[in-house]
Amino acid sequence: MIFRKKKARRGLAQISVLHNKSVVAEQYRTIRTNIEFSSVQTNLRSILVTSSVPGEGKSFSAANLAAVFAQQQEKKVLLVDADLRKPTINQTFQVDNVTGLTNVLVGNASLSETVQKTPIDNLYVLTSGPTPPNPAELLSSKAMGDLISEIYEQFSLVIFDSPPLLAVADAQILANQTDGSVLVVLSGKTKTDTVLKAKDALEQSNAKLLGALLNKKKMKKSEHYSY
């Protein structure tokens, strides 16, 4: 779970590993370890990060998970902004979004031409690119499958930030193409039946749910770390 911070951060300030001693950074490292343990029997190459509805913090979580996985020196990680309707990764990492995922999928650019380095060692991003009229069709295309295969050849792990599950079909399409999914849940806000509907949507896609990430839980004094 990710505890609530008093002030919202913007841009690179959102990335927890840039604040190594923060509680949030340590929480994401714990989540990374839990994901690794949950998939110890499989070769986890791709993770989808999604939520039930908008506003639960999935993009924040995807960016921070990618950053903590990249901290492992042997892992070269790619974060893909597959939320083609409301992309944010370019703003988080302060990179341009002139070309990106959509350009690759329609054949106007190559993966090598669109991947961008971040200030974090071993972490690269593929932004969304221009907003297309047909996001679901692009994400379900043969070109998307081919791109994922190409990414596997160049990166140890790819993390996809997708739209919310109950808003559009995009997340279900991607969940079927990735090795596991993480469902971000906004603490104290998202209703249980909404989360269960999202879980059902993943199951209908034959997706593997790695776990749920409870975001912005109010921290009690007794829950601070002690040494």
Swiss-Prot record:
SUPFAM superfamilies cross-referenced by the UniProt entry: P-loop containing nucleoside triphosphate hydrolases
Pfam family, one: AAA_31
This protein's UniProt keywords: ATP-binding, Kinase, Nucleotide-binding, Transferase, Tyrosine-protein kinase
Group of enzyme by EC: transferase
Reactions that this protein is recorded to catalyse: L-tyrosyl-[protein] + ATP = O-phospho-L-tyrosyl-[protein] + ADP + H(+)
GO function terms (MF aspect): ATP binding; non-membrane spanning protein tyrosine kinase activity
EC number: 2.7.10.2
Family: Belongs to the CpsD/CapB family.
NCBIfam families: eps_fam
PANTHER family: FERRIC ENTEROBACTIN TRANSPORT PROTEIN FEPE, TYROSINE-PROTEIN KINASE
Identification of the protein by name: Putative tyrosine-protein kinase YveL
Species this protein is from: Bacillus subtilis (strain 168)
